[in-house]
C-alpha cells in the first residue's frame, strides 16, 4: 500500500490529477469466496457480492489513509457512492454508466480519488461485482468516463504468462 501511495504522490507532485482504482490485496478475494462457500455452498448471489466486494473496501481505505499520511489530499469511494451503475447480473455485472459529477469536483479541487474496483450498484440498489478481473475493467471504464489522458494498470504478479504457471 505504501509503495502505491508513493507512486501516486509522485504523480500528484508532477501536477497530475489522479484517480486510483484498487483491487483487493493478493489472495483476499479467494479467502472471501472460501468463507462464503463454507457458510453455504448454495449461496445467494446478492450476498456473495456483498462479501467478496469487501476486499476492495479495505484496500481503498488503506490507500486513502496512506496518502493522507503523506500530506496528499485523498478520499476513498465505493462503487455505490460514485455511483458506478451496473446491470443486475450479480457476480458478473456489466457497467452501464458512471456518474463522475462528484469525482470531477474532487479532482478539480486537488484531491486524489481512490476508488474500490470490481464493484458497482444494480438497479435495485444492491452491490454488484464484475467478476474476475473486474478491477481492471473498473479502471478502464472510469478512465474513459473521466476522459483521462491515460490509464496505467499496475499488478502484483511476477509477470505475464501464456499458460497457468501453477500447472
Describe each PLM feature range.
Residues 1-167:
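Nucleotide/pyrophosphate-binding catalytic subdomain
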Amino acid at each position: 500500500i505504501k509503495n502505491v501511495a508513493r507512486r501516486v504522490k509522485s504523480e500528484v507532485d508532477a501536477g497530475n490529477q489522479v484517480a486510483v482504482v484498487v483491487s483487493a490485496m493478493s489472495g483476499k478475494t479467494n479467502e472471501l469466496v472460501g468463507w462464503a462457500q463454507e457458510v453455504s455452498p448454495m449461496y445467494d448471489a446478492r450476498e456473495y457480492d456483498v462479501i467478496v466486494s469487501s476486499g476492495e473496501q479495505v484496500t481503498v481505505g488503506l490507500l486513502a489513509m496512506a496518502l493522507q499520511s503523506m500530506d496528499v489530499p485523498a478520499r476513498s469511494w465505493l462503487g455505490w457512492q460514485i455511483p458506478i451503475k451496473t446491470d443486475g447480473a450479480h457476480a458478473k455485472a456489466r457497467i452501464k454508466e458512471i456518474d463522475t459529477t462528484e469525482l470531477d469536483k474532487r479532482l478539480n479541487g486537488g484531491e486524489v480519488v481512490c476508488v474500490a474496483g470490481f464493484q458497482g450498484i444494480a438497479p435495485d440498489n444492491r452491490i454488484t461485482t464484475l467478476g474476475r478481473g473486474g478491477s481492471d475493467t473498473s479502471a478502464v471504464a472510469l478512465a474513459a468516463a473521466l476522459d483521462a489522458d491515460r490509464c496505467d494498470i499496475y499488478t502484483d504478479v511476477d509477470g505475464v504468462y501464456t499458460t497457468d504457471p501453477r500447472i
